[in-house]
Amino acid sequence: RALLEQIAQKQAAADFQVTGGTRLLLSSIQDDRSNPLNHFANMGTLFDHEDADGLGYRLFVGEELSMLNKLHPELTSRKGQNLLLTGRDQGRVRTTTAFVVMSLLYESLRLQESAAHPLITLFDFGVDTGSGDLLNQMVRTLPEGTIRRYGMPDVLDGIDTLLQEKNSGFRQFVVIFGLNRARRLLVQPDIYSVAPKNKLIELLQTGPENGMNFIVWANSVESFMENYNETLGSFEHRLVSDIQDDQYSIFTYAPAPGSMKPKNAIYFNMDNTENPKIRLYEKPSDDWTGRFIRNMEHALAEKQSTEKNKPNDTEWW
């Protein structure tokens, strides 16, 4: 690992412009010194060597399989700016989802977003994976109100809450882990004034331009296409992996790539003409995870305290 870190450090320091040769691919985020999340876990500070000046939220989920590693999906407040995840391996997708959540938290610090409202709403329909679950650790440990979680029985209440908040002006992200497991969304419309599924479809289609982006794991391609086919255009970002070869064209508008390994994914962006491969990060060590969460807990608590004690500009003295 020490050798990998030395090589990664040299690559990060160099202006890596080459016409041939190879680049070391790092499966673990803790080996990548150029990754802002790794820097934050080690130092507890924002990475000051990056050229990030946009207002979008970058997602650090893996490394591009190319000579340059500058590919990071970026969610903005624009129509269609949702991210769709595919894959049948819950553990692997859950690790990727955890990195999405870590990225959103980090970017909220970089962009100095207000902590007055939950940044992330998590609809967690995953099977319990035990105490080492990264998402569970963040929900339990981070300051109250950072991540708001709904389980299977609460999904309809959560959707109604989001509809009420859609025009509130708050920047927020909604993570749906295991969309096709939420059977309550498919209840027949005659029981409700508006079918629950249609409420979610409205949010997916109109949320992003109102500052509400969705990250959705479609754990069943067949069920997703049967029930939510009309929302596919609302996912202009897609991380596609671990599906049948004849299904890739549905999500990437291209044939299945050759030699797809389990840890690799195709990144589809509606604005790009190519579909690059990404090697998704593996689950980090418990030590790395603990350091990241502790540093994030401290940073968010300090941010909340600062905002709470900030003078009200409308007060008269």
Where are these regions (language model features)?
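P-loop NTPase catalytic phosphate-binding loop
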Residues: 40-253, 257-260, 270-274, 287, ...
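Long, low-complexity, intrinsically disordered segments
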Residues: 309-317
